[in-house]
Amino acid sequence: MAARLCCQLDSSRDVLLLRPLRGQPSGPSVSGTSAGSPSSAASAFSSGHQADIPVGRLPACFYSSAGPCCLGFTCADLRTMDSTVNFVPWHAKRQLGMMQKDFWTAYIRDQLLTLWEEGIIDPRLKLFVLGGCRHKYM
């Protein structure tokens, strides 16, 4: 089960926002609320967000304080949205000669978010998060 979400960095709050592909420009952050149950998670959104976020299409673990069981970053150029690629190998190919990172967290913190904050990543590039797990949809 996977939910396709768009990433957006909110530098004013220093959080990474995850929003549905066709949602409004705001959404739940990765740090998120510490909602433990699906019912309290759904109520964490304002009524304006509930119309935009298909809560029934997201896995139950998406709203847990630990986040989804599995996250995979993909990207697509806005000109060719139908052909998405895995972000990690794509970015690694662009950064040939870059020292290899052993830890995914360090890679995201040191490479992706730094480049994003500095505006180096091409604005035509859209990043998506695929959260997949064995949990049931809410």
UniProtKB/Swiss-Prot annotation:
InterPro entries per record? Transactivation_prot_X
GO term, biological process aspect, one: symbiont-mediated activation of host NF-kappaB cascade
Output this protein's name: Protein X
Question: Bias regions of kind Low complexity — which residues?
Answer: 25-43
Q: How does it assemble?
A: May form homodimer. May interact with host CEBPA, CFLAR, CREB1, DDB1, E4F1, HBXIP, HSPD1/HSP60, NFKBIA, POLR2E and SMAD4. Interacts with host SMC5-SMC6 complex and induces its degradation. Interacts with host TRPC4AP; leading to prevent ubiquitination of TRPC4AP. Interacts with host PLSCR1; this interaction promotes ubiquitination and degradation of HBx and impairs HBx-mediated cell proliferation.
Out of the domains of life, which is the source? Answer: Viruses
Q: Which family does it belong to?
A: Belongs to the orthohepadnavirus protein X family.
User: Could you tell me which residues belong to the region Mitochondrial targeting sequence?
Assistant: 68-113
Gene label? X
One cellular-component annotation, GO:
host cell nucleus
What Pfam families does its record include?
X
Task: Map out region (Disordered) in residue numbers.
Answer: 20-43
Q: Function, please? A: Multifunctional protein that plays a role in silencing host antiviral defenses and promoting viral transcription. Does not seem to be essential for HBV infection. May be directly involved in development of cirrhosis and liver cancer (hepatocellular carcinoma). Most of cytosolic activities involve modulation of cytosolic calcium. The effect on apoptosis is controversial depending on the cell types in which the studies have been conducted. May induce apoptosis by localizing in mitochondria and causing loss of mitochondrial membrane potential.
Question: What keywords is this UniProt entry annotated with?
Answer: Activation of host NF-kappa-B by virus, Activator, Apoptosis, Host cytoplasm, Host G2/M cell cycle arrest by virus, Host mitochondrion, Host nucleus, Host-virus interaction, Modulation of host cell cycle by virus, Transcription, Transcription regulation
UniProt subcellular location: Host cytoplasm; Host nucleus; Host mitochondrion
Q: What is its main location?
A: host cell
Record PTM text: A fraction may be phosphorylated in insect cells and HepG2 cells, a human hepatoblastoma cell line. Phosphorylated in vitro by host protein kinase C or mitogen-activated protein kinase. N-acetylated in insect cells.
